[in-house]
Amino acid sequence: MKKNLFLLVIAFLMCGKVWSGGLLTNTNQNVSFLRNPARGASTEIDAAYTNPAGLAFLTHEGFVFSINNQSAFQTRSLTTTFAPFAGFGDNATKYFEGKATAWVIPSIQAAYKTGDWVFSGNFSVVGGGGTLEFASGLPSFEAQISMIPLSVNQQVGANAFTGYSLESRLKGSSITFGGQLGVTYSILDNFSAYLGVRLNYVNNSYEGYLKNIQLRSANGGVYIPVQNVVPTVGDMNLDLKQTGLGIAPIIGLDYKWNNLNVGITCELKTAIELTNETKENTTGQPQFDDAFKTPYDIPALLSIGAQYDILPALTVSAGYHHFFD
């Protein structure tokens, strides 16, 4: 047993040596999280995700299931001030609004307990999960176009154009599905360990355009298609999907002493490489080309939780999450 414990300790220390890319991890994988977000020492069925080693202390043997759905809606606003923006709408300050919608964010936890063993699984949306749409595009998109009248005026040495107009839109979605399987074993009556893996499948999509770009002439305010003035500038369209797979090893420990329970879970880094499936890319940006590959690692996560039963109907809990990002 000492050898097994030593190997577990070494594996936990490895968490500190794992580094990765952007942070995109959902930890609210059961509706119990909405009641109490400190689930790192749970011994209920949601522990299949939050504290899998704690499943050793399920109150009865046999199968246990939990099927959940959550919905999320969010508005993201950007207010940007940039002098050339005044060429379209006569205001240098512009407001861009994006609406995020996710009607279905499912998760399923299941466990089968027999003696000292518990076999468990979790399927959930471990990253992303919604669609975000900016109906008027983004400020970074429009900023490029807003500079064209000034640039043309400088080249011709006259105030030939006083503004611009365009149509812009961006819609994107990012979903990471995770399927987790693992085994929990009661090493002692009050001490258990878990070993498992999660297969992560990433599916991102992006659709957007900049089109109908026109320049406003100083002569009567007539709008002229930009290509008549700057042939190298035209409509830009983007339609692509990115997919990738990665596997994350997961280990966990749980210790129970009287009314106190402590759980520790470590998810190692998930190395993922996304591959583009591009239907259209006229942006001139090579990172959107078909078959282009992008690193998309999910960072390692160390979760520590504790809960104490003050009374049979009163429990206090606390948790700590550290992403090695």
What is each of the regions a protein language model found here?
Residues 1-4:
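Positively charged n-region of N-terminal signal peptides that target proteins for export
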Residues 6-7, 41:
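Residue-level detector of transmembrane insertion/anchoring sites
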Residues 7-17:
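Bacterial N-terminal signal peptides
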Residues 8-10, 57, 195, 324:
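A ubiquitous, low-specificity "background" feature that marks scattered single residues
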Residues 16-128:
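N-terminal, post-signal peptide beta-strand-biased segments of exported outer-membrane/organellar beta-barrel
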Residues 21-38, 42-43, 103-107, 111-325:
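Outer-membrane beta-barrel porins/channels
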